[in-house]
Amino acid sequence: MKKKANEEKAPKRAKQEAKTEATQENKAKESNKENKNNKAKEGKIKEAKTKESKVKETAKEPIPVKKLSFNEALEELFANSLSDCVSYESIIQISAKVPTLAQIKKIKELCQKYQKKLVSSSEYAKKLNAIDKIKNTEEKQKVLDEELEDGYDFLKEKDFLEWSRSDSPVRMYLREMGDIKLLSKDEEIELSKQIRLGEDIILDAICSVPYLIDFIYAYKDALINRERRVKELFRSFDDDDENSVSDPKKDDDSEEDEENEERKKVVSEKDKKRVEKVQESFKALDKAKKEWLKALEAPIDEKEDELVRSLTLAYKRQTLKDRLYDLEPTSKLINELVKTMETTLKSGDGFEKELKRLEYKLPLFNDTLIANHKKILANITNMTKEDIIAQVPEATMVSVYMDLKKLFLTKEASEEGFDLAPNKLKEILEQIKRGKLISDRAKNKMAKSNLRLVVSIAKRFTSRGLPFLDLIQEGNIGLMKAVDKFEHEKGFKFSTYATWWIKQAISRAIADQARTIRIPIHMIDTINRINKVMRKHIQETGKEPDLEVVAEEVGLSLDKVKNVIKVTKEPISLETPVGNDDDGKFGDFVEDKNIVSSIDHIMREDLKAQIESVLDQLNEREKAVIRMRFGLLDDESDRTLEEIGKELNVTRERVRQIESSAIKKLRSPQYGRILRNYLRI
């Protein structure tokens, strides 16, 4: 019996053991799967973290560049020189000081090794100019050859016809923009170097003429006194504070007055800092100029090595150029310098042409005007604007004479100041123009290659009050600022740097131009804060919050919040159509409170009729006195007793007596009852 019982229990135990083994195996498999999943997740997280860290490293840390020693950098300079010469200034840029005797020995060895000649920066620029002219002629010839080959290409003509079918300027702009290739990072660096090269050539030319340094230094007082805007002439000074802070308006609200006073204090502090910065920069420029002139005018020591002297002068000149580079003169200032130099070169026929061009604007059609014109020209440099106004017959001629005065003054000052031969001056002018051409070409190429970036950013700002083309143009302005301020040495891509400038330019344009009535920038910041709080409450509660809650969260008074919300309301045009008919306009339904209503008009006419009927009870003289005394004539003006007496040829006392007798008659109850009803209305 026991054996049978054990035999019966055996398969049951086996089944239970098999079940337990199966469950253990399943658990083991599940745990293995979980471990694998966890490991995979950890691996992904680690990969993501490593990617993020790599991105952060690439975004934050600049690309490490191996710094070359003086000898290595010098070797590279001589080896990579485009022409058969090397400038003194390029050597100074490597050493950042006057080279030692050992370094000068190395320079001489490299000159012999590479068969290079040491020259000044102006001579080096002249060499590069000659090379550039050859390249330009070759490029022009290539373009002409391509045009001749494509002259009979009918397929391209067909493509042009299809392209020209689109009338939308946005489509045309986007289509043309799509043909421009994007730049690689190496190409961006190369273009940045080209921009710097062009600016170096310009500054080299300016530094070679002391008068041009004085010409730039003369802007110091104009900048401090705000006669000229700083950012028009120099990029290094941030002059955007003038635009960002608007003139505070007068308001009865004491809180707004306090804010305006605080804003004025902030503006005055910024003005002080700006003036200090301008003074420091120009002081450093003046100091560098004096040191350079001192080295230039120092007596020549026959025992001193000529190369040492040349490198010393180059070092002083490079210091002056660095101080000038700190100011970052704009294209507008460089154009003014070019115009000054061109005016100096316009001696003889050139100057006469400019003079005749301005004289053509004057109406000199008789001998008297011609004689007066010659008299003014004889002493125009000593005349003020008031003197010119006193001598010319028409106000329109004053501006022309002021231009003539500027022409004569510029010619006199430049002839005295430049103290250079015309050929030398012409070389410097060509050097400035060439540097500007190199810089402008590189800037244009960099800007054109990033137009797609502007469009992609401008798309995010649509439906904000400005047309899409306007957004693109404002973004392009920001792009050009980014091109001016980009520094490739920091290791960032240009698109990363330019994005902020483009967004800033577009958002500022929307704030300034999107609304019919302009709102100051500081008010827009407050509006955005209030809108953010209101959106947050709507998302959380599903309804608009009370203004008290908004005021508390924003940190403003309730009245201030109400005023800000009033400001945000867009004005409605009087030409807005109303109703289904096209003829109905909103302006037709607006009440004109200056016009008398029809009921008031009827009441007034009825009152006039009743007054006339009452006055008919008086004699002619009494009627005339009452009408003139109480303004019942057509002009509705009250006259004094003296004025009435003069018109009626009676004394003042007699007029008073007539008036009192007439009023006595009108006080009768039968007349007063009629007019009393009008007083109640």
From Swiss-Prot:
Residues 641-660 bind DNA. Residues 1-60, 239-270 are annotated as: Disordered. One of its GO terms (biological process) is DNA-templated transcription initiation. Residues 525-601 are annotated as: Sigma-70 factor domain-3. The keyword Cell division does not apply. One of its GO terms (molecular function) is DNA binding. A motif (Interaction with polymerase core subunit RpoC) lies at residues 470-473. It is found in: Cytoplasm. The keyword DNA-binding applies. One of its GO terms (cellular component) is cytoplasm. Residues 614-668 are annotated as: Sigma-70 factor domain-4. Residues 261-270 have a biased composition (Basic and acidic residues). It holds the Pfam family Sigma70_r2. Keywords: Cytoplasm, DNA-binding, Sigma factor, Transcription, Transcription regulation. Residues 446-516 are annotated as: Sigma-70 factor domain-2. Coiled coil: none annotated. Sigma factors are initiation factors that promote the attachment of RNA polymerase to specific initiation sites and are then released. This sigma factor is the primary sigma factor during exponential growth. Belongs to the sigma-70 factor family. RpoD/SigA subfamily. Interacts transiently with the RNA polymerase catalytic core. NCBIfam families: PRK05658.1 (NF004208), RpoD_Cterm (TIGR02393), sigma70-ECF (TIGR02937). This is RNA polymerase sigma factor RpoD. It comes from Helicobacter pylori (strain J99 / ATCC 700824).
